[in-house]
Amino acid sequence: MNEMENTDPVLQDDLVSKYERELSTEQEEDTPVILTQLNEDGTTSNYFDKRKLKIAPRSTLQFKVGPPFELVRDYCPVVESHTGRTLDLRIIPRIDRGFDHIDEEWVGYKRNYFTLVSTFETANCDLDTFLKSSFDLLVEDSSVESRLRVQYFAIKIKAKNDDDDTEINLVQHTAKRDKGPQFCPSVCPLVPSPLPKHQIIREASNVRNITKMKKYDSTFYLHRDHVNYEEYGVDSLLFSYPEDSIQKVARYERVQFASSISVKKPSQQNKHFSLHVILGAVVDPDTFHGENPGIPYDELALKNGSKGMFVYLQEMKTPPLIIRGRSPSNYASSQRITVRTPSSVNSSQNSTKRKMPSMAQPLNESCLNARPSKRRSKVALGAPNSGASISPIKSRQSTPMEASKENEDPFFRPNKRVETLEHIQNKLGALKNQCPDSSLKYPSSSSRGMEGCLEKEDLVYSSSFSVNMKQIELKPARSFEHENIFKVGSLAFKKINELPHENYDITIEKKSMEQNYLRPEIGSRSECKTSYGNELSLSNISFSILPNSAENFHLETALFPATEEDVPRTFSRILETGSFQNYYQKMDAENADRVYSKGVKLIASGTLPSGIFNREELFEEDSFYKY
C-alpha cells in the first residue's frame, strides 16, 4: 500500500499516455485493410496500406482513382475554317492506378506502374460535325494574325519537378513482363470522346483475348474504313488522321518515373513532382515558323518519315506528387503509433488498461519498457518473475484438482508424451520407498492417501502422456522370425546366422518352431521352385551341405551308400553364399524298418523337420558334421 501511495503522479500520467497510444494503435489495426471509396462517376476505388497488404501487379485491386487535375492554361485558340467559330476544347484526364493519398499527400513509388487515361471534348461541336469540318490555329505574329491548318488533334504526357520546373523522363513498358523494350510515352492522335468509367479501364487493362477486346473496341477506337466517305468532304478532318483506327481514349499504361530521379533516401526532404497532360494540334512544319514565343511546341517524327509540329492548345497538371524511391516498408506513416508491448502482456493487463484512469495499483515499469515488436508474437510470453514453464505442446485444459496434483507430483513431466525407461524406474522406485510392503506393484488403496502418491488416474496412465506397463511386450532371448523360414515341397528350412551353444536345450523353442512352420506355402515364386522326382515313393532323403557353406541347417546325411540310380537335384533358390544338393534314393522294402543312428527318416510326405529332430542332434562347429 505504501508503494502505491508513493507513486509519482507524473509517472502515472506517462504510463496512462503509453497505454492510450497503444490502445489507439490496436484500434487502428482493427480497421479494414482495404477501404472502398465511391468515385464521381459511380465506380469504386480500393485503397489499402501497402505495408500491410501485398497485391499482385496485375490485380484489379491495384487500380484506384488518383489525384485530380487542374488547368494550367490555354495557349492557342482553334477556329472552324469556314465559319470562323471558336472551338471550345477541354481535356478530361484521370489517373486510374499508382498513387495513394497518405497524410494529405499523394504518394507514388518509382518502381510501381501508374496508369493515366485522357480524352478531350468539344462542348459546342458534336463528333460528326467535328469530323466533317476543318480547323485552323489562330497565331498572332507581329500583330498580324495568321492561320495554320490543323492536320489532327493529339495528346501527350510529361512529368516535371515542381522545385525547379525541369522535365523528368517517363518510361513506358510493354505488356510483357521483361526488361524491354522501354520507350517514352508517345503522342496519341485522338478524336473527341467521353472518358470511360474507371471500372471499364480497370477491366480492359490486361485484356489480350481478341474476343474480349472486341467488346471494348467501340469504346476506345473509331474505324475510319467503316464510315461512308460520300458524307465527308475532301478537306474534312477525318482524312487527315494518320491511321484508319483512330483512338478515342489515350491510355498510358505501365508507366514509371525514370530511374534517374534521386529519391533513394527516405530521410531527406520530399521532392515533389507533377504529371502534365497536354492537348495539341499537329500542323505542317513548313507553315509554322515558331516566331511567337508565347506558344510552346514540340517537333514530332511521324511514322511516314516526315516531321510535324505539335503546338500546345491546353495543359492540365496534377497537384504535387511525392515519388518514393524505395519499397513502402521503408516509410512509416506519421499517424501510426509504433509503441507496443508484447501480446501476452496485453492480454494479461486488459483489466488494468480498462481501469487505468483510477490508477488503483501501480503498473510494472518493466512491462511498459519492453521492446516494441513489428508484428504480434505467436508465442505466448510468461509473466515476469514466473518460474512456471509453458509447454509448447497444446493439450486439454486441466481441472483445478489436476492442477494441484501436477504441482505435487515430483515426477510429473507436462511436456513429455512418452514415458522413458528411466522415468518408469524412478516412479516405481519412489512408490517402493513410500510403500515398502507393496514391492514393485501399484500401491494399495490405503496407501494412496499418502502425499506424493499417484492418484487413480495416474495409475492407469493416460494414453496421451505415457505408456501402460501392461502394454510392454516381453520377448524371449532368442526369437525365430518368419522371414527366415522357407517351405519347399514337403520340407521346411530355417536360416540361422550362428549355431546355438552346445548346451542349449532346443526343446525350449520347439513349440514356437512348430507354430512358425505352419505358415502357408510361398506362392509360385520362381526363386522358391525346386525340381525333384516323385519323392512320395521314397522312404528316406539325404542332403549334402557344401563345406564352404555359410548357412547352417540341422540336417545330416544317411549312413547307407548311394546307388547308381541316385539322381542329383539342385535347388534353384540360393541363400546368400549357401549351396545345397539333395539326393533321392530308392530303398528296398526290407530297409524301411532299418534304424539309423544319425539318419533322417520321413514318416510321411507331409512331415516337417521339426517333428523329426531330437534334442541332441546339434552341430558342434560351423564346418563339422557327423556321418
Curated annotation (Swiss-Prot):
GO BP terms in the entry: cell division; meiotic cell cycle; positive regulation of transcription by RNA polymerase II; sporulation
Annotated Gene Ontology cellular component terms? nuclear chromosome
GO-annotated molecular function: DNA-binding transcription factor activity; sequence-specific DNA binding
Task: Name the reported effect of R326A.
Answer: Reduces DNA-binding by 50% and abolishes sporulation
DNA-binding residues (ranges): 28-335
Residues the UniProt record annotates as site (Interaction with DNA)? R58, R111, R177, R208, R254, R326
Q: Which UniProt keywords apply?
A: Cell cycle, Cell division, DNA-binding, Meiosis, Nucleus, Phosphoprotein, Transcription, Transcription regulation
**Where, per UniProt, does this protein localize?**
Nucleus
Question: Can the keyword Cell division be found in this entry's annotation?
Answer: yes
Effect seen on changing R177A: Reduces DNA-binding by 96% and abolishes sporulation
Chain intervals with Polar residues compositional bias: 327-351, 386-401
Question: What does its PTM field state?
Answer: Phosphorylated by pachytene checkpoint kinase IME2, but also phosphorylated in an IME2-independent manner. Phosphorylation probably eliminates SUM1-mediated repression and is also required for full transcriptional activation activity. Phosphorylation of the DNA-binding domain by IME2 does not alter DNA binding affinity.
User: Main localization of the protein?
Assistant: nucleus
Q: Which InterPro entries match?
A: Fungal_trans_regulator, NDT80_DNA-bd_dom, NDT80_DNA-bd_dom_sf, p53-like_TF_DNA-bd_sf
Q: Cite the Pfam families for this sequence.
A: NDT80_PhoG (PF05224)
Substituting R58A results in: Reduces DNA-binding by 65%
Q: What is the effect of changing R97A?
A: Reduces DNA-binding by 67%
Q: Name what induces it.
A: Induced during prophase I of meiosis. Requires protein kinase IME2 for initial expression and continued transcription during meiotic divisions. Can autoactivate its own synthesis.
Q: Where is this region: Disordered?
A: 324-410
Q: Name the reported effect of K54A.
A: Reduces DNA-binding by 50%
Query: What's the effect of swapping K176A?
Result: Reduces DNA-binding by 50% but does not abolish sporulation
Q: What does this protein do?
A: Transcription factor required for successful completion of meiosis and spore formation. Gets activated after completion of meiotic recombination at the end of prophase I. Recognizes and binds to the middle sporulation element (MSE) 5'-C[AG]CAAA[AT]-3' in the promoter region of stage-specific genes that are required for progression through meiosis and sporulation. Competes for binding to MSE with the transcriptional repressor SUM1, which represses middle sporulation-specific genes during mitosis and early sporulation.
Subunit structure of this chain's protein? Binds to DNA as a monomer.
The name of this protein is: Meiosis-specific transcription factor NDT80
Task: Tell me the organism.
Answer: Saccharomyces cerevisiae (strain ATCC 204508 / S288c) (Baker's yeast)
**What taxonomic ancestry is recorded?**
Eukaryota, Fungi, Dikarya, Ascomycota, Saccharomycotina
Q: Which gene encodes it?
A: NDT80
